[in-house]
């Protein structure tokens, strides 16, 4: 079961709690991540990812991921071996590997055993908790016409909304009380689409991107979806 303190904090913080059957919610354990990145990337879809900032939980459901392999993957940061900047990618499974790109950041969850150098990039969330705080972090004004896609669609926006930067690199969200990764809505295989990864120039042909088909918070092209991109979990 999810840690009682974390569960109670979620209940106190957000009206969206009514949508969640907390009795069936479980925090993911290190064993979940100690598997091949493609398997983890697929099974993270529909899971919750959140952190607590100044007493407020911010986060949502994972709706898009990409797997980065420990070998034969030129796009992976581990392709040239362990270095100071990517050391967390070789750490314990479930560790956060955060790296900067174009003045923004990307957040990954490390997979497989220590020293392997594989991870799953979280590309998009469906925002659920602490939405007002996320708008503040993004420097946006919330209104009835503001699209929530501006918060957590794409890895850079996602990190900005959750105030994730290099200071978060190396954190283990399974053990840190201010982070949480937990099970969520179960997705049938018909709701999951697999495509090549996007936004990279090497090994771009590998089918290692996974997303919730039809979910409006997924990044990338509409034509990648089999159903209209307007649904939520």
UniProtKB/Swiss-Prot annotation:
GO biological process: base-excision repair
Database matches in Pfam families: Pur_DNA_glyco
Keyword DNA repair in annotation: yes
EC number from the UniProt entry: 3.2.2.-
Gene Ontology MF term list: alkylbase DNA N-glycosylase activity; DNA binding
InterPro entries the record matches: Formyl_transferase-like_C_sf, MPG, MPG_sf
HAMAP family registered for this protein in UniProt: 3MGH
PANTHER family linked to this entry: DNA-3-METHYLADENINE GLYCOSYLASE
Protein name listed in UniProt: Putative 3-methyladenine DNA glycosylase
Organism: Rhodopirellula baltica (strain DSM 10527 / NCIMB 13988 / SH1)
């Amino acid at each position: 079961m999810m840690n009682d303190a974390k569960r109670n904090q979620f209940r106190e913080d957000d009206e969206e709690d009514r949508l969640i059957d907390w009795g069936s919610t479980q925090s993911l354990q290190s064993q979940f991540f100690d598997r091949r990145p493609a398997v983890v990337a697929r099974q993270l879809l529909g899971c919750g990812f959140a952190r607590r900032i100044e007493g407020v939980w911010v986060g949502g459901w994972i709706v898009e991921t990409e797997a980065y392999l420990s070998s034969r993957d030129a796009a992976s940061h581990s392709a040239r071996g362990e270095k100071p900047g990517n050391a967390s990618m070789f750490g314990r499974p479930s560790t956060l590997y955060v790296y900067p790109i174009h003045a923004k950041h990307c957040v990954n969850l490390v997979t497989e055993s220590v020293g392997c150098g594989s991870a799953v990039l979280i590309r998009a969330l469906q925002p659920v908790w602490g939405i007002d705080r996320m708008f503040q972090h993004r420097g946006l004004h919330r209104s009835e016409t503001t699209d929530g896609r501006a918060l957590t669609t794409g890895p850079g926006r996602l990190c900005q909304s959750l105030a994730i930067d290099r200071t978060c690199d190396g954190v283990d969200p399974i053990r840190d009380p201010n982070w949480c990764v937990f099970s969520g809505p179960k997705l049938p295989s018909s709701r999951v689409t697999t495509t090549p990864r996007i936004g990279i120039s090497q090994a771009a042909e590998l089918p290692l991107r996974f997303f919730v088909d039809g979910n409006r918070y997924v990044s990338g092209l509409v034509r990648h979806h089999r159903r209209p991109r307007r649904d939520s979990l």
